[in-house]
Amino acid sequence: MLRFLTAGESHGPALVAVVEGLPAGLPITIEDVAAELARRRLGFGRGPRMRIEQDEVEFLGGIRHGRTLGSPVAIAIRNTEWPKWSEEMSPAPGKTEKPLTRPRPGHADLVGMQKYGFDDARDVLERASARETAARVAAAALAKALLAHLDAHVLSHVVQLGPVRAAADHRPKPTDLGIVDASSVRCFDPDAEAAMIAAIDRKSVV
């Protein structure tokens, strides 16, 4: 059985993923994980953080000479912005001089503050951040490598966004991954892709 855990905060030194249950001898490289993290940064309307982070990957354990050892695999993804936040996000005892006391609507801030008794929303939002998904992608890259080793391949694509739907006969094959990734909305149907982008732009203006 595969199991994964993630740790780390959005502006901490790194995000960490630990994957348990991989068999020994599975070929895996840093480039395999980095390629999936690069795909995560693709897409229409990505925020500025995506342009800042380069997702530097480091294997901390469980892999030797390009193959898994059968023990848990630990991966670190360094946060580029950590030096700017090293004092604010320090694990050493102390108090912040700039507590965030206004929870953002629609986020986990308020619920997290109530659940854990925090008086600073940053204790919640640093973890409840889209940045944390980088660790999940790193963990999934290992699972994807295992599936590929078993000759099972994965491909996802967008078939509908709001009222815009791709044509039923536009269904990609695993070999079409590059074409899907080239679409800013991951749609294999170029006509639907243009309509999806237009729909997003209309919503952005409202």
In which residue ranges do the predicted regions lie?
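Generic N-terminal targeting/processing segments that precede catalytic cores or assembly contacts
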Residues: M1-S204
